[in-house]
């Protein structure tokens, strides 16, 4: 039986044309970065261009490491450049989540966060399923349904997106998330994943280092 969500995506994909230039807007975190990269892959060779934009500064070591090691081209959004694009997409968020999204007409919205009463997103393609632990899981299901094999960088990004949003399945996540995770492991780059995960520990240790240095100064008078 054909997955209705995949069928919807396949139909939407057929509407893409070479005269379109898309901007994917995200509030950058691992799940959003991975999902945007997956959407860019789904749209590859079907439109004139696809750019990923983040509305926030990226400062966390793990997010910076993810962008660096997985070569994610996420640029800072500049509203004055909106006229350069014909279409706008959003993943792992909804228009009312941030004022930076206001005033933009989105043609595609994909998210796993709960809907808010009175704030129902409107877009020609809109897929919001709170039952998933991560938007990366939804994007993985799309890739599987479209028979698109993700390369090592994209697979690692999606794997890390699921890992962070589910807290490695300790906070959330269901069977769909676990299956997507297991499928992505086969295609991901284990070395790059370890490097990104190590950067998480750096972020966690920084406050400890700071306290240790303060204590050392206090002991020395």
PLM features: residue spans?
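A structured phosphate/pyrophosphate-recognition subdomain
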Residues: 1-28, 37-44, 117-221
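Extended aliphatic helical segments
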Residues: 6, 47-50, 55-58, 91, ...
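Anionic-ligand anchoring segments at beta-strand to alpha-helix junctions in alpha/beta enzyme folds, i.e.
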Residues: 18-81
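Generic detector of well-ordered alpha-helical packing
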Residues: 30-32, 93, 112, 166
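Hydrophobic/aromatic residues located in beta-strands of well-ordered beta-sheets
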Residues: 50-52, 107, 158
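Short secondary-structure boundary/hinge segments and terminal tails
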Residues: 61, 84-86, 161
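Active-site cofactor/cluster-binding pocket
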Residues: 65-125
């Amino acid at each position: 039986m054909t997955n209705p969500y995949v069928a919807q995506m396949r139909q939407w994909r057929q509407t893409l044309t070479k005269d379109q230039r898309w901007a994917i807007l995200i509030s950058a975190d691992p799940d959003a970065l991975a999902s945007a990269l997956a959407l860019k892959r789904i749209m590859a060779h079907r439109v004139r261009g696809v750019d990923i934009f983040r509305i926030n500064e990226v400062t966390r070591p793990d997010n910076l490491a993810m962008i660096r090691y997985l070569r994610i081209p996420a640029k800072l959004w500049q509203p004055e450049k909106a006229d350069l694009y014909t279409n706008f997409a959003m993943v792992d968020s909804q228009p009312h989540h941030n004022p930076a999204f206001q005033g933009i007409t989105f043609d595609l919205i994909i998210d796993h966060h709960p809907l808010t009463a009175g704030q129902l997103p409107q877009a020609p393609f809109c897929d919001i399923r709170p039952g998933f632990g991560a938007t990366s899981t939804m994007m993985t299901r799309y890739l599987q349904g479209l028979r698109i094999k993700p390369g090592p960088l994209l697979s690692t990004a999606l794997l890390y997106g699921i890992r962070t949003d589910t807290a490695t399945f300790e906070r959330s996540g269901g069977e769909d998330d676990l299956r997507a995770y297991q499928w992505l492991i086969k295609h991901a780059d284990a070395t790059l994943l370890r490097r990104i995960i190590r950067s998480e520990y750096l972020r966690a240790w920084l406050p400890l280092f700071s306290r240790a240095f303060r204590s050392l100064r206090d002991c020395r008078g």
